[in-house]
Amino acid sequence: MKLKRTAYLLFLYLSSSLLICIKNSFCNKNNTRCLSGPCQNNSTCKHFPQDNNCCLDTANNLDKDCEDLKDPCFSSPCQGIATCVKIPGEGNFLCQCPPGYSGLNCETATNSCGGNLCQHGGTCRKDPEHPVCICPPGYAGRFCETDHNECASSPCHNGAMCQDGINGYSCFCVPGYQGRHCDLEVDECVSDPCKNEAVCLNEIGRYTCVCPQEFSGVNCELEIDECRSQPCLHGATCQDAPGGYSCDCAPGFLGEHCELSVNECESQPCLHGGLCVDGRNSYHCDCTGSGFTGMHCESLIPLCWSKPCHNDATCEDTVDSYICHCRPGYTGALCETDINECSSNPCQFWGECVELSSEGLYGNTAGLPSSFSYVGASGYVCICQPGFTGIHCEEDVDECLLHPCLNGGTCENLPGNYACHCPFDDTSRTFYGGENCSEILLGCTHHQCLNNGKCIPHFQNGQHGFTCQCLSGYAGPLCETVTTLSFGSNGFLWVTSGSHTGIGPECNISLRFHTVQPNALLLIRGNKDVSMKLELLNGCVHLSIEVWNQLKVLLSISHNTSDGEWHFVEVTIAETLTLALVGGSCKEKCTTKSSVPVENHQSICALQDSFLGGLPMGTANNSVSVLNIYNVPSTPSFVGCLQDIRFDLNHITLENVSSGLSSNVKAGCLGKDWCESQPCQNRGRCINLWQGYQCECDRPYTGSNCLKEYVAGRFGQDDSTGYAAFSVNDNYGQNFSLSMFVRTRQPLGLLLALENSTYQYVSVWLEHGSLALQTPGSPKFMVNFFLSDGNVHLISLRIKPNEIELYQSSQNLGFISVPTWTIRRGDVIFIGGLPDREKTEVYGGFFKGCVQDVRLNSQTLEFFPNSTNNAYDDPILVNVTQGCPGDNTCKSNPCHNGGVCHSLWDDFSCSCPTNTAGRACEQVQWCQLSPCPPTAECQLLPQGFECIANAVFSGLSREILFRSNGNITRELTNITFAFRTHDTNVMILHAEKEPEFLNISIQDARLFFQLRSGNSFYTLHLMGSQLVNDGTWHQVTFSMIDPVAQTSRWQMEVNDQTPFVISEVATGSLNFLKDNTDIYVGDQSVDNPKGLQGCLSTIEIGGIYLSYFENLHGFPGKPQEEQFLKVSTNMVLTGCLPSNACHSSPCLHGGNCEDSYSSYRCACLSGWSGTHCEINIDECFSSPCIHGNCSDGVAAYHCRCEPGYTGVNCEVDVDNCKSHQCANGATCVPEAHGYSCLCFGNFTGRFCRHSRLPSTVCGNEKRNFTCYNGGSCSMFQEDWQCMCWPGFTGEWCEEDINECASDPCINGGLCRDLVNRFLCICDVAFAGERCELDLADDRLLGIFTAVGSGTLALFFILLLAGVASLIASNKRATQGTYSPSGQEKAGPRVEMWIRMPPPALERLI
């Protein structure tokens, strides 16, 4: 269907294209009408079919006879960009001149560059006679109005297309050429595309391969196969060869093409009168009637006719006997013996082996067929036990695939079986058990597990029961036995050999312990020959074995276990000795092994005594605790808890140890966390000692609970001077440390000096608030750490041989290299100063602040010792007081402006009023009072404030007048401001007081400065070198080079770009502006009646601002003495944008952005509106389409007319019946979307071209009815029924199926229901079977544009012939886009064809 429709459309398209092509071909021929030369004035004659007048002379603007001028403006008499206007009825013209020009033809210039005279960015320059436009590259003409056509010189070669650009051009090459001018031919043969030694011929845009004889293809890549024509006969094999072939004949044939058959009967192979019959590469002997048999009739009829062989064996006659060939599974001379294949027991997992030759088992044995056959009697089958499968029952059936386990049980597959692991249901608190977890376990309903033991129920032999899973520290069937023991001081537990069972192949000792002791005995076991000891040394577990008092084994695990947590240790003695620390925080290297130090490891495991926690007390040399019997030295006894002690899996408890064999051991863990009450104060760290605690105090605290604090020494109280001196009472050698806490706010002063009577070892002092350190002969070492901040700092000196390191807390501040010296008894440590004031002043004077907890190594040097046991004698204290109080710094009332003083340690702070600031409230914070309008920024000045803002000038704004307030005393030697504008000539500032004056302006887009001042007779001029009318900000400063001189040259700085512009002459300063001089900002210039149009910052003259805001009502006045006051009363518009708002291109869709400095405005192109030209004006808003749908465009609209209407606005009614196709006398009825045919007589169809389908009477005498619409009568399931034509349904085929019910037409198409089909009437913008093709899609256009005209014409002729043939062969009435012929083979009623033949093709409409 689609093929024929496509062919039909293609036929129409190609026909119209061909006609157009033929028409255009003939239209270009010259006509003989021009042969007479009727045209005058050198004009050209060209024939037009619709007009006999044929003269064309557009170049000379002549009429059709080339005699008179048609348009007086045709020759462009107006010069430049002037506009020529034709005067009606006079044949004359008038020139409308642009600004700056006059005259009849606008040829006279008025020497003015105004009005944007130069186009395309050209720069206008004044000339003595007329303005001159300097054009940018790519443009020419007097006003730069002409785009220079770089393509005029035809720079592109070889048929390339030249595209003109701005100051350049681009060449688009045709295929086969490249390069900027398309002058380089592409050699397509460079890539060697031709294969198999073919010759490559380079051509324009392509290449051609000349192939050898035996190859073909575009690139000669295909070898020619001579065998393709199948030259070899009678099944011969063709062998392809270069340039030829050969035939390998099948047996029985010969010849070049195997065309000759060989006669195998020529040798007369048949004996005894047998008839030879020739075949294809064979023969056979017909022995009929000869009394012989065999291939050549050579054998008498055989003895096997008596069938001597058993079990369906095959009999073979010999010369005087026969041979039986047995079937598989049988043996013997007559095949009478059945081979027993089950003798090797091939079936696994108790499978039963059954031989296939057991004929009696067939029909009643699973796994065997119902009947016996000798063909399958060889072998065996395995009948598997339940749970197994496979040929040999080798595969275990996964019973878990059937999910036998209930209630969430987990199934485990077993050989031939399965096991269910039943869960505990946390929701219902129910245990399940039984084979399939179907039983609710009741054993724990009234369980007796003690001490939080977990009850585990079970169901065995139909009985419910339970077991108890005990927590650590408990054992027994009901967890009733306590296995936790608490060991006090000197406690022990003696386990005799009778307390536990005998030995096995290995022995195992395990226990859990809980202690804070770093050193303790856990276990000792053995005798005088061999002993094993398990102990804690420095918190780590150690295991040692001694043999005859010699240490043989020492194992240890480097992990701290003296942390008050539970730890599990296990010792195993077998072939190797293993020590393991299990669980807890030990993550790696928690197991260590060694060989057993004795030949028989069971000698260590022998039944012998063991001691847990300690040994019975005895005394030996040096008061060491020993085992009295064997005199074994021991570590301190264990204080803590042992739990779950097992000797060879036997629990050791107090109950199974004899009375009197333990001391200070109790059941349970009675340890107390002494640190729980946090007894250590002032950040002290508490250490739990099981029977007490110990506090490690942070400096400067001490005492058992860190409650005491070393008394600080106060130096320089109320600005006094003093020091402290300590005499060293021991020899400390070359390695020692000296540390102290220091608090100060003073940036200078001696902190520490260490010396003897003749030599000063080291001195430490404050310099600019940081520490400095020096030794004799070495440079000063300054530390990058600020100490004088009033905080407490721990300072430490660590003296080593040849080096001193300085620390602040744990931070290393650096080191210095020093000679080695030794601290001896009698040396003196000075703190805070020296007895000699002059020596002290060398280090910035005496120290002011506090020093606390001075330590030499671990010895404390106390200023005020409270014990007579101090290792040092009383120090020398001069003006050193106890504690660390601060001076009363508020005594002198340091706060100004009503500030309130608050005393700090050796410092003060002021609570200042809201309008003041500074350490002493000496600064008034004017800007915090919000003195400026919202559009201005407040800037604090030394004596007041100023409101800073950027002013916006519109070109029509009034000038702003300023005057001095008469109090300016400073020298005015400079002026600074910033601006941005597009003006070329404009005045910025003007001030004048005869004979002195100041002008700052822009001339020819450059900054211009004029000044006459002081006693100078010269007017100073400065002209900038850069253009400043680009709309961006420019920062400008004019200043005297020598500001202290009476006259000086001036310089101009623009945007800090060097070199600066410097004047050639000198003049005075701007001091004349102090004397009531009027200063005008934004004034008009002489040659520009408009004022400044742009932005101007607040101008600064000599550091004094020209504020745009007078003292407004509601805002405080400015307190500074020196001011320039705004005299004019006009309001100044502020709020200039920091940059050109048009730089971001805010205007869309070609809109032109106009910078207004405080904002921007978009001038939109036709069809667009909105702030940014973002709104496409809806031309459809007025509903211009009368009978159609309106599609909005840009500044336009398009009407898509409803069927039956046409015209720009769909206003014209189309007569749809004008070209109707109604046949057979039918009447055309016009409709909105087309027309319909009212059929006459016995005709039907859309165009009434077909006869109505006949009716058939169906049934018998009892039951009869009529089948309409061509339906036929048929017997179906013993009843008469109507079999309907495609497109009809119902019991009597009376209902026409509505093919439009599925709404097949898309994109607004209208569906028309027809017989067995539908027709989509598409909107004008769509086409296709279902209106699915969008005609506006560019992909549907220009498919054939790339084909050459000559080739295309030939292709059209051939294609049209084929299409016409195809249409003729398929010509039939298939209206619309739905073909019933497709339904005939693939429609929903194809299943009826088995009962009724398909209709004739002519009647399927």
Curated annotation (Swiss-Prot):
Entry-listed glycosylation sites: N41, N560, N656, N756, N879, N967, N974, N999, N1189, N1242, N1264
GO cellular component: a single term: cell-cell junction
Keywords, alphabetical: Calcium, Cell junction, Cell membrane, Cell projection, Cytoplasm, Disulfide bond, EGF-like domain, Glycoprotein, Membrane, Repeat, Secreted, Signal, Transmembrane, Transmembrane helix
InterPro entries: ConA-like_dom_sf (IPR013320), EGF-like_Ca-bd_dom (IPR001881), EGF-like_CS (IPR013032), EGF-like_dom (IPR000742), EGF-type_Asp/Asn_hydroxyl_site (IPR000152), EGF_Ca-bd_CS (IPR018097), Growth_fac_rcpt_cys_sf (IPR009030), Laminin_G (IPR001791)
PTM note: Glycosylated.
Transmembrane domains' residue ranges: 1340-1360
Topology Cytoplasmic: residue spans: 1361-1405
Entry's Gene Ontology BP terms: blood vessel remodeling; cellular response to light stimulus; detection of light stimulus involved in visual perception; establishment of bipolar cell polarity involved in cell morphogenesis; eye photoreceptor cell development; gene expression; glial cell differentiation; membrane organization
Extracellular compartment segments: 28-1339
Domain Laminin G-like span(s) in chain numbering: 482-669, 713-884, 950-1136
Signal peptide (UniProt feature, chain positions): 1-27
UniProt entry tagged with the keyword Signal: yes
GO molecular function: calcium ion binding
Disulfide cross-links: C34-C45, C39-C54, C55-C66, C73-C84, C78-C95, C97-C106, C113-C124, C118-C133, C135-C144, C151-C162, C156-C171, C173-C182, C189-C200, C194-C209, C211-C220, C227-C238, C232-C247, C249-C258, C265-C276, C270-C285, C287-C297, C304-C315, C309-C324, C326-C335, C342-C353, C347-C382, C384-C393, C400-C411, C405-C420, C422-C437, C444-C455, C449-C468, C470-C479, C641-C669, C675-C686, C680-C695, C697-C706, C850-C884, C890-C901, C895-C910, C912-C921, C927-C938, C932-C947, C1095-C1136, C1142-C1153, C1147-C1162, C1164-C1173, C1180-C1190, C1185-C1199, C1201-C1210, C1217-C1228, C1222-C1237, C1239-C1248, C1258-C1273, C1267-C1282, C1284-C1293, C1300-C1311, C1305-C1320, C1322-C1331
Domain EGF-like: 30-67, 69-107, 109-145, 147-183, 185-221, 223-259, 261-298, 300-336, 338-394, 396-438, 440-480, 671-707, 886-922, 923-959, 1138-1174, 1176-1211, 1213-1249, 1254-1294, 1296-1332
This protein's record includes keyword DNA-binding: no
Family: Belongs to the Crumbs protein family.
Function per UniProt: Plays a role in photoreceptor morphogenesis in the retina. May maintain cell polarization and adhesion.
Assembly mode: Component of a complex composed of PALS1, CRB1 and EPB41L5. Within the complex, interacts (via intracellular domain) with PALS1 and EPB41L5 (via FERM domain). Forms a complex with MPP4 and PALS1. Interacts with MPDZ/MUPP1 and MPP4.
Disease: Defects in Crb1 are a cause of focal retinal dysplasia and degeneration associated with a shortening of inner and outer segments. Affected mice produce a secreted truncated protein that lacks the single transmembrane and the intracellular domain, and develop irregularities at the outer limiting membrane and loss of photoreceptor cells.
Protein name: Protein crumbs homolog 1
Protein source organism: Mus musculus
